[in-house]
From Swiss-Prot:
Main location: mitochondrion
Family from the record: Belongs to the AAA ATPase family. BCS1 subfamily.
Membrane protein topology class: Single-pass membrane protein
Compartments where located: Mitochondrion inner membrane
Species, as recorded: Dictyostelium discoideum
UniProt keyword terms in alphabetical order: ATP-binding, Chaperone, Hydrolase, Membrane, Mitochondrion, Mitochondrion inner membrane, Nucleotide-binding, Transmembrane, Transmembrane helix
Keyword Electron transport part of the UniProt annotation: no
Ranges in a coiled coil: none
Name of this chain's protein: Probable mitochondrial chaperone BCS1-B
One GO biological process term: protein insertion into mitochondrial inner membrane from matrix
Reaction(s) the record says it catalyses: ATP + H2O = ADP + phosphate + H(+)
GO cellular component: mitochondrial inner membrane; mitochondrion
Amino acid sequence: MENVITNNNKGLPKSILKFIPEPIQPLFENPFFSAGFGLIGVGSILAMGRKGFQQAMIQSRRYFFVSVEVPSKDKSFHWLMEWLATKKNKNTRHVSVETTFHQHESGDIVSRINFVPSVGTHYVFYRGRVIKVERSREKNVIDMNSGNLWESITLTTLGTGRQVFQNLIEEAKEMALEKEEGKTLIYTSMGTDWRRFGHPRRKRPISSVILDKGKSELIIQDVKKFLNNSDWYNDRGIPYRRGYLLYGPPGTGKSSFITALAGELQLSICILNLAGKSVSDTSLNQLLATAPQRSIILLEDIDSAIQTGNHDLSAKSNSANAPSISSGGLQYQGYYGNPSVSSGGSALTFSGLLNALDGVAASEGRILFMTTNHLEKLDKVLIRPGRVDLQIEIGLCSSYQMEQMFLKFYPTDFDLAKQFVEKLENYKFSPAQLQAYFMTYSNNSIEAINNLNELIKK
């Protein structure tokens, strides 16, 4: 009996001990040590098995599943969010709320609440396939361009081809563009990125902005010619970009015409504020290079952003006439030298602006419009050909404009329109002044003629 008990308390069998070096065999003959060794061995085997299973799952996912990640910085992220909002899944328990705005033809703006998948994992069906949707958000990472937390959406499905995702994103894009059809999109600069500003606006009819005879047609035809002749520019090695300057007194319709032009040619408008604190030489180049396709880049009131003092371009600058930057924008007082940055001002230099417009790194495929109330304040180097290719004066109303504006409000009163022009032939008014006057007598053309003294006194 004792022999049996002793043999049962032995460690590893001799058939296994013979493979272990003799100096450490006594350790394995100890039953407690051998039991611990066995547990370690079993644990190691289980750990290896688990790791192998994980690797097998990773490999199988690589071979049998296809995924695509869409970061929040990309436009398609917002297309996908709108598309997912249309997928009514009753089983989805965790959603986020997004409010969008829509403008009716009447001009009324209504809000709409969309429920989109919140952060986490969700499933949707698309063309007979199950799509796994993983929305993630980095709590400590902020997109410096938008100021929002960094997000991404990862789509995963069974298969090896990416065509399903291409079709899905294309469908989401078409759905988003359909909502914008017939609208003018406005973008504003944010850091080095463009962000949508407000809601899409109804297109403004080009006929609603009355310029002097022939000027509207001239600009429209010039922009159309540019848009349709990219090959002509490339074949001749000419940079494919076009610059326009509209100058004239306030209230003459410069910005209004650009808005109507964008609607007429189905273009977006990108408003660039040069006096912004975040605008630098580098960010300006980035903004011009990444502007949305088929868009007008608008520099409004360029004279306010760039205040030019009296200086001799042929003279070398010194500390007294070196260009500097004020909190109101870029103040240029000399042609040579580099501007210095004052606290609270823009980090943009005058030379940086010139290089961004037509330097080596200047972007192509670009339509740039500048407006100014004071042409005399602009430096000639800024508006020379190559930077500004067409300058158009948008002045106070001519007789033609007065008559056309009268007929716009009173379409059938041709005789009264001529009387209106004759009575005001010795006076000058801006279109904004005339429009405000006509709106006072919007339904009575006779009163509009009889009360002209009100307009003249103003």
